[in-house]
């Protein structure tokens, strides 16, 4: 459930696969889900390279991953693949948090991975000119402040002081945005693509459920019937 929810919001993904074991059944599931929910770009990290002494085995695993990606209509031949060891990199940074580039091969692998992500996954275009819409992923209360709904803004912008509607599952209600936060920083507004927490006036935690949406008043209509295409993973 959480993997599907997260993947549906991604502009790109890092697929982690063991260099020692090769693609596992869950690797195939992650690729399939990424394809079906519309993740546009993937970069691969072959982890546990420190456990592989045979360079030919590493090349074989890379080839297997590329073929698997191609079988799900990703450009397997073109996708960047970086081999390294997350554990070794963490251990090196724990021993010396000020390690710079070129000072540790395993830390350098992570720098290379981040560089490949920056280069291969383009900055997405955001629908900031459309009416505000955000699907609610989670809800919690802040003592003395009120109720916060969190999620990724699908389109438009939301500003402090604006009226919004809470739509879906229950009767539509209205509230005023009294705060917008992202990564523990207070913002004047959030926009499409941002993962934010929206503080709502006069709303109790039990008034909002995951699956509801926050929207510009009058911009959407809830429906009780719809057509859907469903993908089922066996076993």
From Swiss-Prot:
Q: InterPro entries attached here? A: EF-Tu_GTPase (IPR050055), EFTu-like_2 (IPR004161), EFTU_2 (IPR033720), P-loop_NTPase (IPR027417), T_Tr_GTP-bd_dom (IPR000795), Transl_B-barrel_sf (IPR009000)
Q: Which GO terms describe its cellular component?
A: cytosol
- CDD domains for this protein: EFTU_II (cd03697)
Task: Recite the UniProt keywords alphabetically.
Answer: Cytoplasm, Elongation factor, GTP-binding, Hydrolase, Nucleotide-binding, Protein biosynthesis
Which residues of the sequence carry a binding annotation for GTP? 47-50
Q: Which PROSITE patterns match?
A: G_TR_2
Q: Does the keyword Phosphoprotein apply?
A: no
Annotated localization: Cytoplasm
Instruction: Show the GO MF annotations.
Output: GTP binding; GTPase activity; translation elongation factor activity
Listed Gene3D superfamilies: P-loop containing nucleotide triphosphate hydrolases, Translation factors
Role summary: GTP hydrolase that promotes the GTP-dependent binding of aminoacyl-tRNA to the A-site of ribosomes during protein biosynthesis.
> Can you tell me which family this protein belongs to?
Belongs to the TRAFAC class translation factor GTPase superfamily. Classic translation factor GTPase family. EF-Tu/EF-1A subfamily.
UniProt protein name? Elongation factor Tu
Lineage of producing organism: Bacteria, Bacillati, Cyanobacteriota, Cyanophyceae, Leptolyngbyales
């Amino acid at each position: 459930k959480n993997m599907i929810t997260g993947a549906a919001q991604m502009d790109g993904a890092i697929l982690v696969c063991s260099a020692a074991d090769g693609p596992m059944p869950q690797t195939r599931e992650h690729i399939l889900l990424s394809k079906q929910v519309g993740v546009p770009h993937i970069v691969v990290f072959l982890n546990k390279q420190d456990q592989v002494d045979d360079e030919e085995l590493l090349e074989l695993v890379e080839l297997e991953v590329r073929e698997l990606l191609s079988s799900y209509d990703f450009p397997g031949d073109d996708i960047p693949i970086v081999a390294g060891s997350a554990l070794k990199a963490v251990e090196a940074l724990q021993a010396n948090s000020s390690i710079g580039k070129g000072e540790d091969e395993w830390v350098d692998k992570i720098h290379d991975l981040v560089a490949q992500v920056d280069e291969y996954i383009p900055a997405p275009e955001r629908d900031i000119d459309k009416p505000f819409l955000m699907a609610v992923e989670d809800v919690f209360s802040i003592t003395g402040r009120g109720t916060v709904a969190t999620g990724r803004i699908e389109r438009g912008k939301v500003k402090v002081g604006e009226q919004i509607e809470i739509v879906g599952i229950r009767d539509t209600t209205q509230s005023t945005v009294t705060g917008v936060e992202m990564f523990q920083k207070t913002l004047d507004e959030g926009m499409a693509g941002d993962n934010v927490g929206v503080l709502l006036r006069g709303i109790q935690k039990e008034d909002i459920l995951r699956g509801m949406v926050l929207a510009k008043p009058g911009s959407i209509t809830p429906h009780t019937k719809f057509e859907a295409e469903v993908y089922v993973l066996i076993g």
